[in-house]
Amino acid sequence: SGSRSTAIGKTTTASGTSSTAMGEDSTASGWYSTATGRNTIASDFGSTVIGQYNSSGSSATSASSFSTSAPAFVIGNGADSSNKSDAFKVLFNGDTTVSNDLTVSGDVVISSDARLKSNIVSLGSTLPKLLQIDGKSYEMKGKQKIGVLAQEIQEVFPELVSEDDNEMLAVN
């Protein structure tokens, strides 16, 4: 396997330089990466993947050199090789994805200080646009929710909507 690498378990592979793979059918191919669990793959430089059947980090963004857009830490929660998924993902640039509900018992504080922002442009009167947004009651992942639909926000405030790697929309 890789130089100065360690593989422990059933059919594990540590092919990246100074990488570690543990568990069953896990692969650490990125340099300095770690894959632990069942069918986990850590293919990016310095990445750590735990759990089973992860989808992020399973194809290299950058295997032998550091990239801020690559996954730093992933918890895989897939069912099998045809149904790979991630419960949690943190990129080296700090972007974080939680794939289900996030429960916080303390405060969530989001910085909005004008001193942190640049190129500030007024949107003008936004009240007429806000009145076009219709709140909804809906079911999501088996739970009753209240909120808005990203597609409706996108029609009125397209700059507030982004798309993830799976083409799912999110509201900022």
Residue ranges and their predicted role:
Residues S1-S99:
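Periodic small-residue-enriched repeat registers in elongated scaffold domains
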Residues G94-N172:
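C-terminal intramolecular chaperone/autoprocessing and neck/assembly modules of extracellular spikes
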